[in-house]
Structure formats: C-alpha cells, structure tokens
Amino acid sequence: MKNKLPPFIEIYRALIATPSISATEEALDQSNADLITLLADWFKDLGFNVEVQPVPGTRNKFNMLASIGQGAGGLLLAGHTDTVPFDDGRWTRDPFTLTEHDGKLYGLGTADMKGFFAFILDALRDVDVTKLKKPLYILATADEETSMAGARYFAETTALRPDCAIIGEPTSLQPVRAHKGHISNAIRIQGQSGHSSDPARGVNAIELMHDAIGHILQLRDNLKERYHYEAFTVPYPTLNLGHIHGGDASNRICACCELHMDIRPLPGMTLNELNGLLNDALAPVSERWPGRLTVDELHPPIPGYECPPNHQLVEVVEKLLGAKTEVVNYCTEAPFIQTLCPTLVLGPGSINQAHQPDEYLETRFIKPTRELITQVIHHFCWH
C-alpha cells in the first residue's frame, strides 16, 4: 500500500543509514543484505513482485529485481546499492546520517547512488501501477564499485528483455549514451637473480621490462592512430603505465619486475580484440625470452558501451529534458545492461561528488528527477 511508504526524505535517510560498502579488502567490505531487505519491503508494499538473487563469488552480496505489470518489453530502472569506503579523517559529517544544509543533502551514497532508489519510490506514489500496459522493472545491484559482479551476473542469467533501461548514476540529469571501457593488467617479467659483478650469470628482469615497455608504448601510439570517436573529449583509446616495481638491491641482478597498466577502449572495441593487440605487442619479448613474461588481469574488464543515437529511448529522453545525449570517460554498469536492451545513463547529482568526502546531492534535483521518472514510466509502460 502506498500509504505505508515513508516520506521521501525518510526513505533517503534510511538508505544512507544502512551501510553497504564495497571494497576489495575483506576488512572493509560489507554485505548489502540489509539494504536489499529495506528496498524489497518498500517495493512489496507498492505491489511489486520481488526477487532477491545471491551473487556468486561475492561476500554475501545480493541483487534485487522488483517487477510489476504483464507482457513483453517495458522499462528497467537500475542502480547499484553499494558505496565506496570513506576516509573518516576527511569527512566533516557522519557519512551514515543524512544531513540537509544550504540546499544540499549530505551523506555517503546520496549522489552515488543510493538516493536514486528514493526518487523511484517517491515517483511511484503518483503512478497507478494497476494500469500499466507494459511491465516496469527496478534492478538494484551489488559490487558496482569493485567488480560489477552484480550487474554481470544479472545480465548473464536473466531472461528479461525490456524495451529500454535507464541507470540512475549521477549525471546532473544530462543523458549519457556512451562511455569508454576499462582494462587493467599486470605485466610480470621473471628474470634470474645473481651478483651484479657478473651480469652474464643472471637475467635482469628490469632490462626485459624496458624492452616490453617499448613495445607497449608502440601499441599506445597505434591505438591513438587507428581508433577514433570524435564525441569523446579524448577521442581515442588511452593506455597508461601506472605502477612499476622491480628488484631489491643495487648490487643484485633483478629477478622480478612487475608493471601495472590500463587501457580505456572506445565503444565497439571488443575485449578479445584488445587482448589480442596487447599479446601481439608483447610477442617479440615472449619469443626472445620464452616463459619469462606473463600478463594477468588486475580487475575484471569492462567493455565500452554505446546506445544507438537514433533509438527511441534517446529521442524520448532528449525531448523530455531538452538536452542532447553526451558521452563520458568514466565507467558504469551500462555495458552489461546494454546486452539486454538499449540503455541510457541518467540520474540526479553530479559525478564530481562521487567518491568524495562530504558527498552531497543538491536539492534542486529533487523535483525534476521525480518528474522525469514519472514521465518515462508513463511513456514506456502506459503507451
């Protein structure tokens, strides 16, 4: 029953007060079970059918799918339930207490992106869900801030095929239809230690890595020359050498050297294609020094993403907002949801607030976000 639903600000307050931090470090990582239970109960009160899905390979994490309405197609509204860890020394407020001050709502997850679920629930007060002609789905995922395991698993296992989807990441209500991907690798060279007084008795891993880096930088130049997408501010795939470590003493031949690097591919570039390009670039080193070079993933890769610019979803949202869709360099769950249906990234709050101390969402987004959610539900589920 709608009258059982708390007021908007109380929903928001309860979401922020329920910790759901995702972290690669086990000591910081938290289950999102309590938050999923909170959301599930509210959507059940609104008449939705709710499914809770354990996400394999995680530390007690869950997805939630709330659905209402019959038939094929419909609209999917999606978001992640987790937040990044917080630096207690840099926050001047309690991260888990929603605080309103000077036109801003402060708290961990206010913008990125627990707040989106408060907007959805609040908008549904004015929607007669018994009259939907197409289904409405609400997806809440786990571990977006680390591995994106929730969205990956949902996309791999669901039979759902909505007409379109909107992911409510903070875009300042500017619709995003494309972003780059992200691939990070560790390049490891195994040499052979020895005393520096006799170089011939060892294999210096730093020298081999120097050779490998030359080929990697050549790949970087080739990516810049071969691939182009004018809409991006950096209109080509980027390759960055981010961290290197090797050796332990100036008088010892270095036995091991490790380089961490990333590539941010354009939409349309496949992960297999990128892996092939990297392996081809490093092939001369591997052939010259068999068995000494390995390439391993640092994190699960994220492909680039693009919603067709002429899709009905793009046209409808651009008309409703009076704004053209954009492309961005950061990553979201959109590549995985896009495998189910055309997807836009669009939500309240600024991406500049994501992962920041004293995170906030400006209250000026409340009314237009509520109106937008109501309008897209009416357009895609009532017509």
Swiss-Prot record:
Q: Where is Zn(2+) 1 bound in this sequence?
A: H80, D112, E169
Q: Which residues act catalytically here?
A: D82, E144
Q: What EC number(s) does its UniProt record assign?
A: 3.5.1.16
Keyword Hydrolase attributed: yes
Q: Where does Zn(2+) 2 bind?
A: D112, E145, H355
CDD domains linked to this entry: M20_ArgE
Molecular-function annotations in GO: acetylornithine deacetylase activity; cobalt ion binding; zinc ion binding
Q: Which reaction does it catalyse?
A: N(2)-acetyl-L-ornithine + H2O = L-ornithine + acetate
Provide the primary localization.
Answer: cytoplasm
GO CC term (a single one): cytoplasm
Q: How is the cofactor bound?
A: Binds 2 Zn(2+) or Co(2+) ions per subunit.
The compartments listed are: Cytoplasm
Swiss-Prot/TrEMBL cofactor(s): Zn(2+); Co(2+); glutathione
Q: In which pathway does it act?
A: Amino-acid biosynthesis; L-arginine biosynthesis; L-ornithine from N(2)-acetyl-L-ornithine (linear): step 1/1
Which keywords are on file for this protein? Amino-acid biosynthesis, Arginine biosynthesis, Cobalt, Cytoplasm, Hydrolase, Metal-binding, Zinc
Which class of enzymes does this protein belong to? hydrolase
Among Pfam families, the record links this protein to: M20_dimer (PF07687), Peptidase_M20 (PF01546)
For this protein, the record's Gene3D superfamilies field holds: 3.30.70.360, Zn peptidases (3.40.630.10)
GO biological process: what's one of them?
A: L-arginine biosynthetic process
Functional summary from the UniProt entry:
Catalyzes the hydrolysis of the amide bond of N(2)-acetylated L-amino acids. Cleaves the acetyl group from N-acetyl-L-ornithine to form L-ornithine, an intermediate in L-arginine biosynthesis pathway, and a branchpoint in the synthesis of polyamines.
Q: Which family does it belong to?
A: Belongs to the peptidase M20A family. ArgE subfamily.
Q: Which PANTHER family match?
A: ACETYLORNITHINE DEACETYLASE (PTHR43808:SF1)
Q: Quaternary structure?
A: Homodimer.
What this protein is called in its record is: Acetylornithine deacetylase
The organism of origin for this protein: Escherichia coli (strain K12)
Q: What is the lineage of its organism?
A: Bacteria, Pseudomonadati, Pseudomonadota, Gammaproteobacteria, Enterobacterales
